Structure formats: C-alpha cells, structure tokens
C-alpha cells in the first residue's frame, strides 16, 4: 500500500509519488497527500474549500471567482477558482 502522507504539489505527476494517492490543494501550489478511499470526506472538503472547483458555476456559487482553472495534471479531479477579470491571471 502506498504511503499517502505529507506535502505535495498539485502539479506533481503522479501526485504524492504514487498513483494510489491524491493531492488535495490548500493553496494554489501546495497541498497534502491523502488516500482516496475516504472519497466522501474528500468531496465534502472540496465543497467547503472556497477555491477548489469542478466547474465555473461552482466558483460563482462559492463567490470566489467566475472561472474554474483546471490543474494541468490528469490525476487532479478539480481546479482553482479565479476571477477572469482578475489581475492575478
């Protein structure tokens, strides 16, 4: 079994040095590794995180932007909310 602990980057491929683990971002470039067996808790955490998203509509509902930018990593099932009019882009 993979050791799904520690810090990670959502840009790492595979995240957490194993395809059995997932990286949950807590900031745009950093996060923590988890074992995806607890998917309901992961889904809840994504729902509650103000910037994690799976769609533009989700960003609008959360009030954290109007564009869900997907991570360029096929191991990541979500993206980060941005305001498309933002200077940050």
Curated annotation (Swiss-Prot):
Leader sequence segment: 1
Keyword hit for Disulfide bond: yes
Classification via Pfam families: Albumin_I, Albumin_I_a
A single GO molecular function term of this UniProt record: toxin activity
Keywords: Disulfide bond, Knottin, Seed storage protein, Signal, Storage protein, Toxin
Propeptide: 39-46
Post-translational modification: The C-terminal glycine may be removed from A1b.
Task of the protein: A1b binds to basic 7S globulin (BG) and stimulates its phosphorylation activity.
Domain notes: The presence of a 'disulfide through disulfide knot' structurally defines this protein as a knottin.
Protein name, per record: Albumin-1
Organism encoding this protein: Vigna radiata var. radiata (Mung bean)
Phylogenetic placement of the source organism: Eukaryota, Viridiplantae, Streptophyta, Embryophyta, Tracheophyta
Designated gene of the protein: LEG
């Amino acid at each position: 079994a993979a050791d799904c602990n520690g810090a990670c980057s959502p840009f790492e491929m595979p995240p957490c040095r194993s395809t059995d683990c997932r990286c949950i971002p807590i900031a745009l470039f950093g996060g923590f590794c988890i074992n995806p067996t607890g998917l309901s808790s992961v889904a809840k955490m994504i729902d509650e995180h103000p910037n994690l998203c799976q769609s533009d509509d989700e960003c609008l509902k959360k009030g954290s932007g109007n564009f869900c930018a997907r991570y360029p990593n096929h191991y990541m099932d979500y993206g980060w909310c941005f305001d498309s009019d933002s200077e940050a882009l």
